[in-house]
């Protein structure tokens, strides 16, 4: 077994979801990591901070000596046992620290002395992160970017999920992109969003598609920001427009904004707490667009929401939510979409219903 995994292997280990042991401190891991990694630190946050302070004041040798003093005996054995337990479940794991330096080498040595082998990754987290950032920057030159646009509720995300040549940006951001797009689970950190986007793009490139199909998004998907160079490529790309009649859009939005959302909240929090959280989510979502709506229209929508919630709670009937959804489309989402589409009409190369969109995409696959 090789003791060091070279940088030339970064793409492979990410594509195959290689199990990774991250020996950085928890505070480093929380800021950003990789989806198939587990944090089993060599040093905890406080220990790392003490070693860092010592390094600045007294130099490397003193810092290393302090590290050994802090992580010895029972503490050291606990760290080793955690690594060995992970390796017994995933013997094909690699380990990494921040730069592929002393922490990686020391962890590898202690594991080896305990009777098991594990390679560490050259360059560590920092180098893999640079590789992923470069992957995002290069992606628009690897496959032609194609944007799927469509009015709110047209089912763009469903089409994205049905196409092999797509990358689901909203799925990676864990947010549906609108004021009502927040999910019960938190969004990833910005760094993790970018890391996951890069891995998704690597997998897309491996399949050698002619197009990179992306849903039309703002630069911010919730609080996840698309990298500037990548978003700039999206802003210049050709657009295909998905048409969908209002009578098909309304039930889809009722499911997205109300039925599925309430199910998620109740499942996560229990019936009463879930309903209260769902109610707060609707109020907060409306509040997020209050300035654009104006006070009068915001209040009109909030009154309709309150009435729909009362009917839902007393009669177990969600249909009254269609009143405010319909009005929201009429006074806010539809005019905004049509205005934005008009500004980029010169980039639209095809427009049609779902079947026509799929036929067009199939025709232009190669």
Swiss-Prot record:
Residues 14-137 form the Rhodanese domain. The keyword Transferase applies. The active site is at 97 (s-selanylcysteine intermediate). Its EC number is 2.9.1.3. The keyword Transmembrane does not apply. Keywords: Selenium, Transferase. It catalyses: 5-methylaminomethyl-2-thiouridine(34) in tRNA + selenophosphate + (2E)-geranyl diphosphate + H2O + H(+) = 5-methylaminomethyl-2-selenouridine(34) in tRNA + (2E)-thiogeraniol + phosphate + diphosphate; 5-methylaminomethyl-2-thiouridine(34) in tRNA + (2E)-geranyl diphosphate = 5-methylaminomethyl-S-(2E)-geranyl-thiouridine(34) in tRNA + diphosphate; 5-methylaminomethyl-S-(2E)-geranyl-thiouridine(34) in tRNA + selenophosphate + H(+) = 5-methylaminomethyl-2-(Se-phospho)selenouridine(34) in tRNA + (2E)-thiogeraniol; 5-methylaminomethyl-2-(Se-phospho)selenouridine(34) in tRNA + H2O = 5-methylaminomethyl-2-selenouridine(34) in tRNA + phosphate. One of its GO terms (molecular function) is tRNA 2-selenouridine synthase activity. GO terms for biological process: tRNA wobble uridine modification. SUPFAM superfamilies: P-loop containing nucleoside triphosphate hydrolases, Rhodanese/Cell cycle control phosphatase. Belongs to the SelU family. Monomer. This is tRNA 2-selenouridine synthase. The lineage of its organism: Bacteria, Pseudomonadati, Pseudomonadota, Gammaproteobacteria, Alteromonadales.
């Amino acid at each position: 077994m090789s003791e060091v995994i070279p940088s030339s292997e970064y793409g492979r280990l990410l594509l195959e979801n290689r199990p990774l042991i991250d020996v950085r401190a928890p505070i480093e891991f929380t800021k950003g990591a990789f989806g198939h990694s587990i944090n089993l630190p060599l040093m905890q946050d406080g220990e790392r901070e003490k070693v860092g302070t010592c390094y600045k004041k007294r130099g490397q040798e003193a810092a290393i000596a302090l590290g050994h003093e802090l992580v010895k005996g029972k503490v050291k054995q606990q760290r080793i046992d955690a690594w060995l337990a992970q390796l017994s479940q995933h013997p094909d794991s690699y380990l990494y620290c921040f730069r592929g330096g002393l922490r990686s080498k020391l962890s590898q040595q202690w594991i080896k002395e305990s009777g098991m082998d594990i390679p560490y990754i050259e360059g560590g987290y920092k180098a893999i992160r640079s590789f992923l950032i470069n992957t995002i920057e290069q992606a628009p030159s690897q496959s032609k970017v194609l944007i799927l646009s469509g009015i709110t509720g047209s089912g763009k995300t469903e089409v994205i999920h049905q196409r092999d040549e797509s990358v689901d940006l909203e799925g990676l951001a864990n947010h549906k992109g609108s004021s009502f797009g927040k999910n019960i689970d938190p969004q990833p950190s910005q760094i993790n969003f970018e890391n996951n986007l890069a891995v998704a793009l690597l997998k897309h490139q491996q399949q050698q598609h002619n197009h990179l199909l992306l849903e039309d998004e703002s630069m911010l998907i919730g609080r996840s920001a698309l990298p500037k160079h990548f978003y700039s490529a999206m802003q210049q790309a050709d657009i295909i427009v998905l048409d969908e009649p209002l009578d098909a859009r309304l039930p889809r939005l009722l499911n997205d904004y109300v039925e599925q959302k309430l199910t998620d909240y109740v499942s996560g929090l229990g019936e009463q707490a879930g309903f209260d959280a769902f109610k707060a989510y609707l109020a907060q979502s409306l509040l997020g667009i209050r300035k654009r709506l104006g006070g009068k229209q915001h209040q009109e929508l909030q009154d309709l929401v309150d009435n729909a919630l009362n009917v839902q709670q007393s009669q177990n009937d969600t249909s009254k939510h269609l009143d405010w959804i319909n009005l929201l489309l009429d006074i806010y989402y539809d005019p905004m979409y049509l205005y934005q589409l008009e500004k980029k009409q010169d980039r639209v190369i095809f427009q049609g219903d779902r079947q026509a969109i799929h036929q067009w995409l199939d025709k232009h696959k190669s």
